[in-house]
């Protein structure tokens, strides 16, 4: 309903849900519509294109993109594969390794493997050397992530991560840490890199509260809205030109390797002493669509949205020019026999 257009209503989800209507999305001869449920169905809205601005499982991980693909609706951003790869921290690292892209040393395992041979898993983790970062493999927003300095902390952190996922990843923590983010806009054919930001925090990593509720103690203070758009940052990042350009090139390599589209944000970890750069992870639907990075790159928010939508329309048209299936009925000559294979001797 109209209440969904009032951002203040999102402060109270229970009230919002009471007044909102459930709808379905359908495609009728190329016309995309939202329709109410129930006996007397009415068209709520006609759609030209969908702009997903969502977080979490079943949203960023390719699920909602798969639903939109099934319905046939054009949408902004990365497709099913890119979205799912961008959500699985283990698979994405395996891809980066195959392309010699820089990542921190890590080990991963399933929860059942940990319970079957806890000592062996702990032994592998110890070889990385403390401090370590323990993460659920498929969650974002820093949920379930723990920074650990010893064996006891490691075991507790693994137990915590298992509450959120069946697959766990343990990474060597980067010391002398500088956190830098770069947004990328484009598709597999062309990529633009934004101005870099340096994220300021006294914690080992940004928490969920830092990212979405604007909490946590930081070294600098800023004004603005809550969440990632108001996280304390320095723009542009305080890096030399060579390092800045290297980060931008790696960001574009990541974007292309995962077949991303639209706008994303690639998060980096830099060792301030050695100046080594490591890919942390991509965010296929970044908080605030990283508009603040593009504004710093002389691309206003309205222009960013226009370019994202233009890319989506182009991608939709290109896809429908490809041949993905052949119209044939393999059962047309079926007569109860075992078919061709059944006749072979």
Question: Where does each model-flagged region fall?
Answer:
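ATP-binding N-terminal substructure of ATP-dependent carboxylate-amine bond-forming enzymes
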Residues: 1-81, 85-91, 110-120, 324, ...
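ATP-dependent carboxylate activation and anion-phosphoryl transfer catalytic cores
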Residues: 100, 228, 232-345
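Phosphate-binding site of ATP-dependent enzymes
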Residues: 146-226, 238-246, 277
